[in-house]
Amino acid sequence: MENRNRNSRPIKNQDPVNEFIRAHQVLVIDEDKQNLGVMSKRQALEIARSKNLDLYQVGVQPDGTVITRIVNFGKLKYEQQKKSKEAKKHQTKIENKEIRITVNIGKHDLETKARKAKEFLEEGSRVKVSLKFRGREVVYLDLGQQTLNNFFELVSDVGKMEKEAKLNGKFLDMYIVPKKN
């Protein structure tokens, strides 16, 4: 562990740019993607500074030679952030919703819970149906299976079963996902 003063800030993970590249010899690629060959880090930094650009570590070759590129680091970082934001926009996030029922649930209550599950499925959420066994009700596993099957029949027009009912402790869990149109 590192010795640090209590009042000092934690050291940020620094990108391998310019002086922060930990190598004496580097393979340099210029801004036009031309290979300039292996040279000392100092020489490479001078070339980059003469063009008002930065020396950025791209990777390491199997023999240990550090591959660097002469780029505008601020612009590179901005482009990377832009790409990651764009990727996040197009990412679909599936939300998980849970509905709890019991073995001896009434018919109307089951229909009400199924109606709510249909709403969740129409929104595009994944629904976990948990049937809770209280006390010694676990011995009526077949009754629990039947209740979950009845529940699934009520929502089968908008959802499909992702995972079959499985006993997990005192819960019998089943997962339903929306049907693709």
Curated annotation (Swiss-Prot):
Q: Record's family?
A: Belongs to the IF-3 family.
What this protein is reported to do is described as:
IF-3 binds to the 30S ribosomal subunit and shifts the equilibrium between 70S ribosomes and their 50S and 30S subunits in favor of the free subunits, thus enhancing the availability of 30S subunits on which protein synthesis initiation begins.
Which SUPFAM superfamilies does the entry link to?
A: Translation initiation factor IF3, C-terminal domain, Translation initiation factor IF3, N-terminal domain
Q: Which organism's genome codes for this protein? A: Mycoplasma mycoides subsp. mycoides SC (strain CCUG 32753 / NCTC 10114 / PG1)
Q: What is this protein called?
A: Translation initiation factor IF-3
> Which HAMAP family does the entry link to?
IF_3
Give the UniProt record's GO annotations in the biological process aspect: ribosome disassembly
- Taxonomy of the source species: Bacteria, Bacillati, Mycoplasmatota, Mollicutes, Mycoplasmataceae
Its annotated compartments are:
Cytoplasm
